[in-house]
Amino acid sequence: MVPVIVIPVLNRYDLLERCLASIDYPVDTLIIIDNGGQASLWGCPWLVDHRQIDDYRIWSMPSNLGVATSWNLSIKATPYSKDGWLLLNSDAWFEPGALKHFHGECSPDTITLAGRPGWSCAHVGRNVVAKIGLFCENFHPAYFEDNDFERRAQAHGVPIVHSTAKVNHDNSSTIASDPSLAEANGRSFQANQMLYEKRWANGVPTHEEWDLDRRVELGWDR
């Protein structure tokens, strides 16, 4: 069973429906972060296959949290996840049997990637988060947060596993569906690239502040 799947979404809810329909392997908790605030998302309870998904959460946000913040929020909300977190793009989908295949290659000690680009379907092991912290939220709203995290992980000796599971992805469909987002991305992408280069100019960036082990040790909910 997959402990946690996290899917942020901003638009193209039709692709989210396709993504959900492709989940054909047991999942303990599914978290959908609705950064677009669309009422149509509330149709998701009827789209979730309750034979596969034990529990789900739909969080509708008043503004776009961005990718890194969405992932971090989900990790913070599920600190007891057994082996880690499966981070899935809303415009990605699994071929039959691919989710089981992918999960079988995941480990608490690794980052496991599938699809193209690899971070369209990524599993981040809990020991990886315990070692290097969360994603840098200054990369907003998208791009370079994954490059930065993967590079930090490699600098700390974390193995990167490239899965052979068949995961499909309509790359950049969020931006392609809205000219205003494409224009905004032209600005934010450049700014995020500059931040990435600045963060790595003098070696490995500092550890992100939030600490998984401390959260679990001091928590009142376990």
Regions found by a protein language model. Name each.
Residues 82-93:
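Short beta-strand-to-loop acidic/aromatic patch adjacent to the donor-nucleotide binding site
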Residues 3-15, 19, 33:
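A conserved hydrophobic helix/loop-capping motif in glycosyltransferases and polysaccharide synthases
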Residues 97-114:
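Conserved donor-nucleotide/metal-binding helix-loop-beta segment in metal-dependent transferases, i.e.
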Residues 61-78:
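Glycine-rich, basic loop-to-helix element that forms the pyrophosphate-binding segment
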Residues 124-143, 152-163:
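Aromatic-glycine-rich donor-binding/catalytic loop that engages nucleotide-sugar donors
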Residues 22, 34-47, 91-93:
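A conserved acidic beta->alpha catalytic loop
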